[in-house]
């Protein structure tokens, strides 16, 4: 078995970012997915945050989210590129190599995979100039792209070394999508893996996703099967826990991180 780098999203824990980082380091994780909101409430600069993570032995492995980017009319696309450059500035200061670009949920997004591919290619090209990478993830409630197969098809069309796929067990399994096809994706084109489970609940997928996810094995989704197919692809990057859950946000964070 390969030893995968273990990370956890800062959104998975309660407390200030400083408290979260301490709990994550104490629980033995290698790195974090940094949520922009956590960074915005951090009292110091991006450089100071990078130093703090370094001191705790944590890498900042992923910055997120970058929303509503691809498949946009030209004027909105140009504005989004400006937005991207500001994100890249922050990432450079954080020493963070990868940004998560989630599939567009905006009503202005066009159902045009070729346009989405071309726009993501441009984003990847700009990231590459700074030595950064872009991971594209299908959100279960994306407007035109909500399945990993659709996201992978767009990544293939974009055909850029600095653009890859981000997989999330919740987004795939919550829609009842079959993860078997992940095994056919070249492992090096998968840039990041997020794992979350959830109890089976009757509600909109966005409410379910944002309030009721839990750790792998604590819910009713077949996360093991999903993980198995991802390993079969040859993927050997991060194994990250991204858990949105109201209870965890109110629980002492050391206990959550150790669990």
Task: Name what the model sees in each region.
Residues 27-36, 61-68, 103:
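Short, conserved active-site loops that position catalytic residues or coordinate cofactors/metal ions
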Residues 1-7, 14-27, 54-56, 95, ...:
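Histidine-acidic metal/acid-base catalytic patches
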Residues 41-60, 132:
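Short acidic, glycine/proline-enriched helix-loop-strand junctions
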Residues 36-37, 65, 101-104, 139, ...:
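Active-site loop/turn elements of alpha/beta-hydrolase fold enzymes
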Residues 33, 62-64, 100, 135, ...:
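Conserved beta-strand positions in the central sheet of alpha/beta enzyme cores
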Residues 30-31, 59, 97, 133, ...:
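Residue-level detector of anion-binding/catalytic polar loops
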Residues 10-18, 34-48, 68-78, 105-111, ...:
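Acidic-and-aromatic substrate-binding clefts and catalytic sites of carbohydrate-active enzymes
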């Amino acid at each position: 078995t390969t030893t995968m780098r273990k990370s956890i999203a800062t959104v998975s824990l309660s407390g200030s970012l400083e408290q979260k980082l301490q709990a994550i380091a104490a629980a033995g994780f290698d790195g974090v997915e940094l949520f922009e909101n956590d960074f915005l409430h951090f009292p110091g600069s991006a450089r100071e945050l990078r130093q703090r993570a370094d001191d705790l032995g944590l890498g900042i492995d992923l910055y997120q989210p970058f929303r509503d980017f691809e498949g946009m009319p030209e004027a909105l696309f140009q504005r989004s590129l400006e937005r991207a450059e500001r994100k890249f500035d922050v990432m450079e200061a954080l020493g963070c190599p990868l940004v998560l670009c989630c599939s567009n949920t905006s009503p202005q997004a066009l159902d045009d995979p070729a346009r989405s591919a071309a726009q993501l290619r441009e984003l990847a090209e700009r990231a590459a100039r700074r030595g950064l990478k872009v991971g594209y993830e299908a959100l279960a409630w994306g407007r035109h792209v909500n399945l990993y197969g659709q996201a992978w098809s767009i990544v293939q069309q974009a055909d850029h070394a600095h653009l890859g796929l981000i997989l999330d067990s919740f987004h795939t399994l919550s829609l009842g999508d079959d993860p078997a096809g992940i095994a056919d994706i070249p492992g090096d084109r998968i840039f990041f893996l997020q794992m979350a489970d959830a109890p089976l609940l009757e509600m909109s997928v966005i409410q379910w996703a944002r309030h009721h996810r839990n750790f792998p094995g604590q819910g009713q989704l077949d996360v093991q099967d999903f993980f198995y197919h991802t390993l079969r692809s040859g993927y050997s990057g991060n194994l990250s826990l991204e858990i949105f859950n109201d209870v965890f946000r109110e629980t002492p964070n050391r206990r959550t991180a150790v669990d």
